[in-house]
């Protein structure tokens, strides 16, 4: 009976350990990101995605890292992954709108802005800024 309890205990420890380590990858990666250690944090966010492919926050932080590295293709890919997993992610939506504004994709910006107005709760103050930037760019194009 005691052997059975020991085996059961060991089994439980092994089952719990991987779930704890998954969370540690994200937490440690976020801490490194906040310290400005982008390469180290990028590796840990990618590692977290391997163990937890539905973690939208890891994709969001990877998008931020790729934005800092000026790698637009990877940035957009990770933003889209974030929005696929969490369509109401305000930060990802705002990043995508900003990216599309820089590329002068006005129709997409208008479409995304409508969605952004529906989902915004913390970044609603950015809506006026988006509309102003869109108006300024359109005015420059007309002149």
Residue spans for each PLM region:
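Canonical tetratricopeptide repeat
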Residues: 61, 95, 129-133
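Canonical positions in the second alpha-helix
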Residues: 47-48, 81-82, 115-116
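Register position in tetratricopeptide repeats
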Residues: 34-35, 68-69, 102, 119, ...
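Alpha-helical segment of the N-proximal tetratricopeptide repeat
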Residues: 23-47, 51
């Amino acid at each position: 009976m005691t052997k059975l309890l020991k085996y059961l205990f060991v089994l439980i420890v092994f089952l719990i350990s991987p779930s704890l380590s998954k969370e540690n990858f994200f937490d440690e990666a976020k801490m490194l990101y906040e310290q400005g250690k982008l390469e180290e944090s990028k590796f840990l966010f990618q590692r977290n995605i391997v163990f937890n492919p539905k973690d939208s926050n890891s994709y969001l932080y990877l998008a931020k890292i790729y934005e800092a590295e000026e790698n637009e293709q990877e940035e957009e890919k990770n933003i889209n992954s974030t929005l696929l997993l969490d369509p109401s992610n305000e930060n990802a939506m705002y990043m995508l709108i900003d990216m599309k504004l820089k590329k002068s994709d006005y129709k997409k910006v208008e479409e995304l802005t409508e969605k952004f107005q529906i989902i915004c709760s913390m970044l609603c103050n950015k809506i006026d800024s988006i509309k102003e930037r869109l108006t300024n760019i359109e005015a420059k194009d007309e002149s």
